[in-house]
Amino acid sequence: MKTELLKEKYIKYELTQDDVFKHQHYIIITRSGIEKIAAIENIGIHFEIVKCETNFAAVKAIGDNGEISIETFGSALKGESYKDGNTNTWYCLEMAEKGAMSRVVLKLTGFYELGVFGEDEAEDFKKNNN
C-alpha cells in the first residue's frame, strides 16, 4: 500500500530519479523535488526567525496550500563536525530555512506520513553521504 501511494505521488508531482533517492533507512526527496512539489501544490510559505546567532538559527515555517495551514520548525547548529552540530557552514539561518521548507512541503502533501524526508532536513540525508 505504501509503495502504491508513493508511486502515485511521484507521478502526480512529476518526480524523476534526480528528485528522489533511497537513504540507508529512508526515502529522501532532493531540493529540486521539494521545489517541484511546492510549485504544483501552490504552497505558500512564510518564515519567522525564532533565534539567529553566530552559529545557531531556528526558523518557524508556516505553510499553506489553500486548504490546510501548518507550522513547523527548522534549526541549524554549526559545529566542527556533525558530531557537535548539524551543519558545518556559517550560513545557519539559510540552512534552518531550507530544512523548515522541506518539512512544510512534505507534511502538507502527505509524504511525511509515508516516511519520506527532505534532503535539506539533515546533513546525513545528503545524497553523497549514503
Language model segments and positions:
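Polyanion-binding surfaces on beta-sheet-dominated domains and ring/shell assemblies
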Residues: 1-130
